């Protein structure tokens, strides 16, 4: 179990919906500090969080996840002055706008990757950090395709690929930073929005989704924290229908293991074996 007591948590997401409900649960776990970076100010939400645990220090920054990495660095330099260090980074910024592919990809994938690249040096054990945990909050349609939300699904598939790649022992054994993802199923805060399909053929399905059964935002937030507490490096979770399920990961490329061994090996025989198999 990952013990959140005394931890310094940084949450990059709008403090509403899933992020707010997740933060509420985090505040019951005796964390020491919570930094919230979001696109708009939400003083009532911050006050609500503070009322749960007065001793937890909460810091807030207005933050655009799509900004350039150089600009992000300036923000996180300020964050570190207040936080001292980051134990847990949660990436939860999300956008589903099939009419604006660039914004969807930049928010869900590019922005998340830039955030991780910016924060990792502060956490990296070999760079003076203490290691820690990165949590990427994503969607079940990052595991299975969506014929309705094609751009959104593509961005979420990217999150899973990035998470699994960064969790490789090649990195984890060096920097001490575990990486995991939580894939949320249909959640009330999402389906209550006006949703537009990638192509007009799918719009009737998008409209129908608003009437479909879904999990409450509060339950989803609770299960995100449950996943964090049960986390292992590289683990992917599904938080759906009020439950939490670990995903069985597979290698589909038949040469994957040999390729990794080839890349990591200094033994000429291992390298010759891989090249011979091709």
UniProtKB/Swiss-Prot annotation:
GO molecular function per UniProt: oxidoreductase activity
Top-level taxonomic group = Eukaryota
Q: Which Pfam families match?
A: adh_short (PF00106)
Q: Where does NAD(+) bind?
A: 11-34
Task: Kindly state which keywords UniProt assigns to this record, in alphabetical order.
Answer: Oxidoreductase
Say if the entry is tagged with keyword Oxidoreductase. yes
> What is one term from the GO cellular component aspect held by the record?
cytoplasm
Q: What residues form the catalytic site here?
A: 152
Which residues are recorded as binding substrate?
139
Q: Which family does it belong to?
A: Belongs to the short-chain dehydrogenases/reductases (SDR) family.
Q: What is this protein called?
A: Alcohol dehydrogenase-related 31 kDa protein
